From Swiss-Prot:
Organism, as annotated: Acremonium sp
EC code: 3.7.1.-
The keyword Mitochondrion is assigned to this record: no
Catalytic residues, chain numbering: S258 (nucleophile)
Subunit structure: Homodimer.
InterPro entries named in the record: AB_hydrolase_1 (IPR000073), AB_hydrolase_fold (IPR029058), FrsA_esterase (IPR050261)
Known pathway: Mycotoxin biosynthesis
UniProt keyword annotations, A-Z: Hydrolase
Family to which the UniProt record says this protein belongs: Belongs to the AB hydrolase superfamily. FUS2 hydrolase family.
Protein name: Alpha/beta hydrolase ucsC
GO MF annotation list: hydrolase activity
Gene: ucsC
This protein's record includes keyword Hydrolase: yes
Domain of life: Eukaryota
Function: Alpha/beta hydrolase; part of the gene cluster that mediates the biosynthesis of UCS1025A, a member of the pyrrolizidinone family that acts as a strong telomerase inhibitor and displays potent antibacterial and antitumor properties. These compounds share a hemiaminal-containing pyrrolizidinone core fused with a gamma-lactone, giving a furopyrrolizidine that is connected to a decalin fragment. The polyketide synthase module (PKS) of the PKS-NRPS ucsA is responsible for the synthesis of the polyketide backbone via the condensation of an acetyl-CoA starter unit with 6 malonyl-CoA units.
Length: 492
């Protein structure tokens, strides 16, 4: 059967193609303690392709073993390794519940409990972090008539006293999640580095994300700016009520990855946002989806020659053979609040910056043709060229750069790497340390933060070489010669 979502033949390291980005996403968190190489390799070697139950059980077993290690390490007073174990357990529990959208309704409660275990493990890790981590609740009142208010759960990462920037208040970065990320996972994309650089980091589960979707049942909103408005209001209130945090409400920036990049850009139109980093964002969700679907099938549906039932039937039948297709439509349906696969595809049309394609455009945005014309703050936009058939920078990244008409060229920056090690995978999976370097370098520049070069100074004689010589001059030569001789003798 024709695959609904196509992939290029290259850059696949696992037998089942869909696992490539998902597992790269996991191993990519290793530099910040979210994964262990040996644990990862052992699991992947035994993982059956195209099997959601196998995925769930393997990751659950690994998560429980890792959590137990964390408890043992914590009891022994070994805080650093315990923190790492808790972070890994949190990430493995996230993976264990990842397939929840395609599980029967009777098992949804079971998978929600696993999600809470992921949160609890993260909380245990947070208690052992160098910086302060605070659980927060962000009030959000949807603008629709009689829509119930909801509390958005969040984590606020605050730099410790010795990590704060000298001579100024603490800037804050809002980190927006993507389609299926959890805010605990966002730690590896922003909060792992931010506090150490003097930034406060706020992550949260917005509508259609994390607990806000799973427990409150609130679907995603195409007008992400109304959510960011509530988040900004919360930050201002928090800063006023907690002067000890020393937050700079005039130095708030925002970032997001993939779909989160789209939401971050919508939020960047608020004048309280002073800079935006949009990581591999989407310009028009529907157009991107159509580029990855068989045109011979979708063309008659788009022109009403074929009803929704044909699309629904094709998706359901293909989902029986392919977990990736089943997950994509199940996750998207829950996220959007769509009643059927065809409706989910139709709902994608609202996720665009083209104002002439959205229902509320004329009411809210005057004569502008593109929402991005409202963004005036400095913007760093990235693309992912590592798999041209999966994500198309020319359809999203390039279109976004063209339509940021009111951002001066000197305040726009573009980065489209190709190799995965350089950030060529979607959401920069596998290159998160490099992403954070580029992100905070841009924010430092635009927010006027000067750090100065701090070259590493080596202390003479600090390390002892072979035969007791220091690693300087003759001591270094002696150490190298001794090591070389040892290796040579061992080989022969």
């Amino acid at each position: 059967m024709y695959p609904f979502f196509t992939y290029s033949p290259g850059r696949h390291y696992f037998e089942y193609k869909w696992y490539n980005l998902e597992l790269l996403r996991l191993i990519g968190s290793a530099p910040y303690g979210g994964c262990d190489a040996a644990e990862f390799l052992e699991l992947v070697a035994s993982l059956k392709p195209n099997d959601a139950d196998e995925w769930h059980h393997k990751f659950l077993a690994l998560a429980e073993r890792t959590q137990a290690k964390g408890e043992q390490m914590s009891e022994a007073g070994h805080e650093a390794v315990a923190r790492g174990a808790y972070l890994r357990a949190s990430n493995y529990f996230r993976c264990a519940q990842y397939m929840f959208p395609i599980m029967p309704a009777a098992r949804q409660g079971e998978f929600l409990k696993l999600y809470h275990r992921s949160i609890r493990s993260f909380e245990q890790a947070a208690e052992l972090m160098e910086h302060r981590v605070e659980r927060v609740s962000i009030p959000f009142q949807p603008p629709e008539y009689r829509a119930p208010a909801v509390e958005l759960p969040g984590w606020l990462h605050l730099p410790a006293a010795h990590q704060r920037l000298s001579g100024r208040k603490t800037p804050l970065l809002i980190c927006v999640g993507g389609a299926d990320s959890t805010q605990e996972e966002l730690y590896f994309l922003s909060a792992a580095e931010g506090p150490g650089l003097g930034y406060a980091i706020l992550t949260f589960d917005g509508p259609g994300q994390g607990l806000t979707l799973r427990e409150s049942g609130v679907p995603l909103r195409p007008d992400g700016e109304v959510v960011i408005e509530a988040v900004l209001d919360f930050i201002e209130s928090y800063a006023a009520e907690h002067p000890e945090a020393d937050l700079d409400v005039d130095a708030i920036s925002i970032t997001g990855q993939s779909l989160g990049g789209y939401l971050a850009l919508r939020g960047a139109a608020d004048p309280r946002i002073k800079a935006c980093v949009a990581v591999d964002p989407i310009y028009d969700f529907y157009d991107l989806a159509m580029s990855r679907m068989p045109r011979w099938f979708m063309w008659p549906w788009e022109r009403n020659y074929m009803g929704d039932g044909f699309v629904d039937f094709a998706v359901i039948e293909h989902s029986k053979l392919d977990v990736a297709t089943k997950y994509t439509f199940a996750q998207g349906g829950q996220m959007f609040g769509s009643a059927s696969p065809a409706q989910m595809i139709r709902d994608m049309k609202q996720y665009t910056f083209r104002l002439d394609k959205t229902i509320t455009a004329s009411k809210r945005h005057g004569n502008n043709r593109d929402y991005l014309e409202w963004v005036t703050c400095p913007v760093f936009v990235t693309g992912a060229a590592g798999d041209e058939k999966l994500f198309l920078p020319e359809m999203s990244t390039s279109a976004i750069m063209r339509n940021l008409a009111n951002v001066p060229d000197e305040h726009k920056e573009l980065w489209i790497p190709k190799e995965w090690s350089e950030g060529g995978a979607q959401a920069k999976s596998g290159a998160w340390p490099l992403l954070q370097h580029r992100c905070f370098k841009f924010l430092d520049e635009k927010l006027g933060i000067s750090r100065g070069a701090k070259p590493v100074q080596l202390k003479t004689g600090f390390v002892k070489g072979v035969n007791g010589h220091g690693l300087t001059n003759g001591g270094l030569n002696g150490a190298l010669n001794g090591a070389t001789n040892g290796i040579t003798n061992g080989v022969h």
